[in-house]
């Protein structure tokens, strides 16, 4: 949730990371701002450090040199994940790469976690970017009240959102919440006219079924603002993060879908008459 700084004029938020030179979250060269806190509980999340809204301590054992200076770890083996930053602090970091954004038609993408959990902070940051000619996008699970998204729309060029499962009971089981709001918000977003991309993470044995992908693709076809439907292959790179946080990775050992299986699902989606892309999450 967004906070108010001591000056009462500069809102602050909890940020886990600011990743520069990202090429997968919108057009051109981008900087991705990762917000801390998510209202879903997907057990495959490859950014588990962004789920809790509060700062956390993490221990990366492979970086430990047993020097005894744990409070000021020189190797990054012990780190605090999540820093409180003001809009101005974050914007200064983003603005440093203005020339790259302009040359590549790039910009800034808000990700997470779930940026709409800190909607006021997100809005102010997007507004600041828009005022200075920086392209903007947001990645969201689209499951929070649409009013939070509405506040961001005047300052957004593009929205990326997930539809993980069309079966509501299964969606509740694996994310902790219903998909009803997601689907309703997707339709409301379509009426806004803002360009959108729908994504499905392909989790082996859960979301990667022909039935699920076909049903999502059929729904996507009803959304006139969607530029394309993206299938994101399973990403096992989050396993170390779970260990660092003292958490169990229930999907440890699972591997991404092979190219043939990925292509087969893409063909299923294409049968709905929509543009489909696929790749690594």
Label every PLM stretch briefly.
Residues 4-27, 204-281:
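Auxiliary Fe-S-binding modules of radical SAM enzymes
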Residues 11-28, 32-51, 56:
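N-terminal cysteine/histidine-rich coordination modules
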Residues 32-45, 58-77, 82, 114:
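Cysteine-centered iron-sulfur cluster-binding motifs in ferredoxin-type domains/subunits
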Residues 79, 172-178, 246-254:
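Short glycine-enriched, charge-decorated loop/helix-capping segments at active-site entrances
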Residues 83-87:
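Disulfide-bonded cysteine-rich modules in secreted/extracellular proteins
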Residues 91-244:
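Conserved AdoMet/S-adenosylmethionine-binding subsite of the radical SAM
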């Amino acid at each position: 949730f967004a906070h108010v700084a001591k000056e009462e004029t500069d809102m602050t938020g909890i940020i886990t990371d600011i990743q520069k030179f990202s090429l997968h979250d919108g057009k051109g060269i981008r900087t991705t701002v990762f917000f801390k806190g998510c209202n879903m509980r997907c057990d495959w999340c490859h950014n588990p450090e962004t789920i809790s809204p509060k700062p956390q301590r993490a221990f990366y054992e492979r970086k430990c040199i047993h020097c005894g200076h744990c409070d000021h770890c020189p190797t990054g083996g012990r780190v605090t994940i999540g820093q409180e930053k003001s809009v101005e602090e974050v914007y200064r970091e983003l603005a440093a790469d203005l020339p790259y954004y302009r040359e590549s038609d790039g910009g800034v993408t808000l990700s997470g976690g779930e940026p709409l959990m800190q909607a006021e902070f997100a809005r102010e940051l997007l507004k600041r970017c828009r005022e200075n000619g920086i392209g903007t996008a947001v990645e969201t699970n689209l499951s929070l009240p649409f009013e939070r998204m509405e506040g961001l729309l005047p300052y957004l060029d593009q929205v990326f959102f997930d539809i993980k499962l069309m079966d509501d009971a299964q969606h509740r089981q694996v994310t902790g919440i219903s998909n009803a709001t997601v689907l309703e918000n997707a339709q409301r977003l379509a009426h806004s006219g803002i360009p959108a991309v729908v994504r499905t993470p392909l989790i082996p044995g859960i979301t990667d079924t022909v039935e699920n992908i076909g049903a999502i693709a059929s729904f996507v076809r009803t959304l006139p603002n969607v530029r394309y439907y993206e299938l994101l292959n399973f990403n096992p790179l989050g396993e170390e993060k779970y260990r660092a946080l003292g958490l169990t990775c229930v999907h440890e050992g699972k591997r991404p879908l092979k190219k043939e299986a990925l292509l087969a699902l893409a063909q299923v989606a294409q049968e709905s008459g929509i543009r489909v892309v696929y790749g690594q999450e």
